[in-house]
C-alpha cells in the first residue's frame, strides 16, 4: 500500500482545495454576466431590431443548440485533457464570443455570436465538475459544487448592477465589450494556479490524503456506448432535461416578465433581480451544505442527496402562482425561493456522476446530461415563445416550472434508487 501521502496524526489538513473552488466561483460569475446580458437587454434590443417573441425564442434556441452539441463534446474533452486546459480553452472561446455580440447588426449576427457563446460556455460545468472530482472527496463535493455554482447567482446579480449603467452611458455594444474584456483577466490566473492535486507544489501531504481518502477508481477508458447502458447516466441526464429549462427560463425571460407584469425597465430591473439572485445564492450553498452535513451525521449518500432534493422540489412549487402576485416584491419572493430551490436541487444533482461513476467517466456523464438539459431548454424556449405570442401570459410557463422538480426527483429515484457505485 502506498502511504507516501499519509500525514502525521497531528498534521493539520490544509485548505488549498478551496482556492480551486474560488477560481471556479469567479469563472461562473463571469460566465453568467456573459450569458445574462442578452436577457437584460431584451426589451431594448427587441425595440431597436424589431424582434418578435418568436425571434427572441429563436435566439435562445440556437444558443442552446450549440450548447447541447458542445456540452457532450466538452465532457469527453475534460476527461481526456483535464480541467486545467479544458476549462481554459472553453473560457477563452466564450469570452471572445461574448465580445463578438458588439458587432451584430441584426438577428442573424446575434444568433452567430450566441452560438459561439454556447460552444464555449458549455465547457464551464463539465470543467467545474471535473475539477471538483479531482480536488475533493465525495463527502465534500456537493458543498464545493454549491459554492462554485453560487458564482452563477453572483454573476446574475452583477449583471443588472453593471450592464444598465454601461448601456445607458455608452450604448449596448459597449456593455458586451467592457464586460468581455474585463473577464479575460481570469484566464492567466487559472492557467498559473491549477494543477492536479499530486502535481501541485503548494499542496500538503495531509490535504492530499484527505482528497484521496475515497477508494481508488479503476483506470480504464469508458466509452459513451457503455455509459448509455447505465441507468444512473439516464437518472442524471433526464433530471437535467427536466430542470435545466426552468433555469434557462428565469435567466432569459425574467427581466421581460418583470417588465410586462410590473412595468420595470432597464433603470429599475436592478433591485428585484439582485434580490432574486441573492436568494439563489442561499439555495446554492445551502443545498450543498445540507446534504454534506447529513452525510457527516451518518446518512448515506442516497438519503442525504434525495432528502435535500425533496426539500428543494417542494420549495419550488409556489412559483406556479408567481403571475398572480399583487406586487413586484411578492413576485420577487416567490420567484427567489424557486430559484434558490433550483440551485439547491442542482448542487446535489450535479454530484450524482462523481458519487456513482469512476472519475474517468465523470466528465462524459456530465456532458451527456448537459446535452439533455440543453435539449430540454430548446423545447421549453419554443414553448415559451409560442405561449407568449398566442396567450400573452407567463402563467402556463410558471406552472411547468413549479412541477418540474418533483417530477425530476421521481425520475432520479426510479432510475437510481440507491445511488450505489456503478459497476463498469
Model-derived regions, located:
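Extracellular/periplasmic helix-loop-helix junction of adjacent transmembrane segments
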Residues: 39-69
